[in-house]
UniProtKB/Swiss-Prot annotation:
Family statement drawn from the similarity comment of this UniProt entry: Belongs to the HdeA family.
HAMAP family, per the entry: HdeA (MF_00946)
Species this chain originates from: Brucella ovis (strain ATCC 25840 / 63/290 / NCTC 10512)
UniProt name for this protein: Probable acid stress chaperone HdeA
GO cellular component: outer membrane-bounded periplasmic space
InterPro entries associated with the record: HdeA (IPR024972), HdeA/HdeB_sf (IPR038303), HdeA_sf (IPR036831), HNS-dep_expression_A/B (IPR010486)
Pfam families, alphabetized: HdeA (PF06411)
Gene: hdeA
Amino acid sequence: MIKTLFNKNTALAAVAILALSGSAMAESAKTHKTDMAKKKVSELTCEDFNGLEESFKPTVVGWVVGFNKKGKEEDAVIDVDGIETVTPAIIEACKQEPKASFWKKAEAELKKVF
C-alpha cells in the first residue's frame, strides 16, 4: 500500500497554484478559481470542487483525509488507495448537490471508507 505525506501548508499552496493555472481557461473560469483560492476549505462548496480539473480532485480529497478531526493542521500519512476509492463517491455526491458544503460531503463519504 502506497502512503504519502501531506501537510496543510503544502496542500493549500498546491490548491492555490493549480486553481489559478491554465492559460486556455475562459475568463469566467479564471474568476471562479481565483475566488476559490481565497476561500478556507471549510467554505468550499461542491460547486467549487466540481470546477476543479479532474486530475486534481484526488489531491484535494487527500488533503481532507489528512486534516485531523479537530480542524487543526497536522502532518498525516495518507492512504492513497483509500483516496482513489472515495474520490469518485465524493465527486458524485457533489454533482448531486452543487450548493452543498464540500467539507460536509467529503466527511460523509470518508466515514464510509475510512
